[in-house]
Amino acid sequence: MLEKMFKLKENNTTAKTEVIAGITTFMTMAYILAVNPNLLSQAGMDPTAVLIATCLASFIGTFAMALLANYPFALAPGMGLNAYFAFTVCGNMGYSWKVALMAVFFEGIIFIILSLTNVREAIFNAIPTTLKKGVSAGIGLFIAFIGLQGGHIVVNNDSTLLSYVNFRDNWHTEGICAVLALIGLLLTAILYIKKVKGSILIGILATWILGMICQAAGVYRIDADAGFYSLYPTFAMTDFSKIGETFGQCFTADFHGVGIMNFIVVKLSFLFVDMFDTIGTLIGVSDKAGMLDEDGKLPNVKQALMADAIATSAGAVLGTSTTTTFVESSAGVGAGARTGLASIVTGLLFLLAIFFAPIFTAIPGFATAPALIFVGFLMVSAIVKVDFEDLTDAVPAYLCLIAMPLMYSIAEGIAIGVISFVLINLICGKRKKITPLMYILAVLFICKYIFL
């Protein structure tokens, strides 16, 4: 049955590999169960309700991806989009969270229409192959940077923006976390090189267990004010009645005092970031998995984009910010995921997480950091496929690559890559390389920087 539904042999994988990879993806994404409720609660939403909505939206989106597209991509409320929801729309603009949810719902509906009319598929296919390699490598650097932050290996510095962690001054918090993350990275790399099945998942679990041992020995110390909590999982149950506080509330939004133009700007902002984050993630992860054809196209991209659109609208109704395809899916791909069976496993774990949320939210950032850093390395390898003899191809790919981690946005990296590709090739007399849709995208990106 599994073979017929997911074509395991055709994709050179096994059920065991897919299950392990699906668990790996979930483990690297589990932080969203802690982060999303925390962020959206600052917009006035009930954190338990947001937690349940996050689990359900992730389950729906990931299952849709598995059943519609048969791809090992997992979905959840997107980082960055949830911060924009809480701090910009509900914070600086002063709108209620119900109005913000309505904007997300409309964005999802627009995406469904765009997916049905092949617009999003056309955008995906219009991006040149060389730029897709830059996107893939850029995402690798981006998730490696996220891992370095989560592992407390790089920390904030007022003078240089970033610096290496000071082990001596913060040994019992940041220091020991960074050491554990580095040990986990070394362990993951060795296991992967030795071709041990589930090496990335083993790395996550081993690092977490080492952390709990350090807490028991007094080496790791809890400092809640600084964001360092107990590493032991708890077994409290979730209050399911809370979901009523967010479910369907987007339809009760009071638009009194909400300017139509401001609402359109909010909707377009959600639309822009979600669209190109998703396209960028699909390019990067599918390239790493070897799913792109000779022309750089993804066979079932229309179905994948439809799953993403459905998840966004469903998430808004349930009570969470924009649901999107997660770049952490690359961790599962690195562990061998090639079909929707891995997504089924990840989706089921999100559903189960509703009942055991405190256990999954106990997974610390330093435990998932090795997975993100190592998978980042695997994805950066795509850059070797860029033709560095043709600078009109290489320079845009390079700009795209460095923009993603430095601007902390996949969408911004794609924007910089598209604009630079069009301008460089246009000015250098290589207009035949530029498709009409690339011209349109470049103009839209430039307008976005001017007006949004």
Regions found by a protein language model. Name each.
Residues G44-F63:
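Loop-to-helix transition at the N-terminal end of transmembrane alpha-helices
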Residues G61-F73, A189-K195, S269-D277, D308-L318, ...:
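Transmembrane alpha-helix interface/packing and boundary motifs in multi-pass membrane proteins
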Residues M1-A49, V165-D169, I204-K302, F445-C447:
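Helix-loop-helix hairpins and the membrane-proximal interhelical loops
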Residues P47-T48, F73, W97, I410:
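Membrane-helix interface/capping residues of multi-pass secondary transporters
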Residues M93-I209, I213, I344-L452:
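Membrane-embedded alpha-helical modules
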